[in-house]
A protein has these predicted regions:
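Conserved small/polar residues in nucleotide/adenosyl-binding loops
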Residues: 169-171
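A structured beta-alpha segment of the ubiquitous adenosine-cofactor-binding alpha/beta core
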Residues: 75-116, 122-125
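Aromatic pocket-lining residues of Rossmann-like dinucleotide-binding sites
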Residues: 42
Length: 172
């Protein structure tokens, strides 16, 4: 087999799987603690188009938990720092950035009609709810992180359907 940057991934999922990733458009809301690692994984998996949404800049307190945070990136716009990182890993990836605070009102104008998946990694509960409701109404597949900040017992981490009761107030 001819070697290329995604050769190992191709061994796992085959050429068809690789093509599916390459032709996918994924939108990530929030590129902080959860979102930056999500973007990194999607980039390294070979997703063809990534749309990043975050209004924040990198700060000193991000150094311990956000993949794009270094002393060189402090005070820089997170989505732009992440875009530069993505393109240093996968030059063929199309990266679209929006430096904007997510609200119920701007969600419809941000999400393109042809998006395949949405990842919710935002902290603001009202925006999180609005995003899930919008995607649900439009039939857009969404993965939502309810956050694990200040949690010390990894055995308590749960993955579940948001519509099933799992005991987190932010999921009700």
């Amino acid at each position: 087999m001819l070697q290329h940057p995604l050769s190992r991934t191709e061994l796992l999922i085959g050429k068809d799987g690789l093509d599916k990733l390459r032709n996918s458009k994924v939108m990530i809301f929030g590129v902080g603690g959860v979102g930056s690692y999500t973007v990194e994984a999607l980039t390294r998996a070979g997703v063809g188009t990534l749309i990043l949404v975050d209004d924040d800049t990198v700060c000193l307190t991000n150094l311990n938990r956000q993949i794009h945070a270094t002393y060189k990136t402090i005070s820089k716009v997170k989505v732009e720092v992440m875009k530069e990182r993505i393109l240093s890993i996968n030059r063929k990836c199309e990266v679209i950035t929006h430096q904007v605070f997510v609200t119920k009102e701007n969600i419809p104008e941000l999400i393109p009609d042809d998006v395949d998946y949405v990842v919710d990694a935002i902290d603001t509960v009202s925006a999180k709810i609005a995003l899930v409701e919008y995607c649900s109404a439009k039939g857009i597949k969404i993965m939502s992180s309810m956050g694990t900040g200040n949690k010390f017992d990894p055995t308590q981490f749960k993955v579940a359907d948001i519509y099933k009761k799992i005991g987190r107030a932010s999921c009700r």
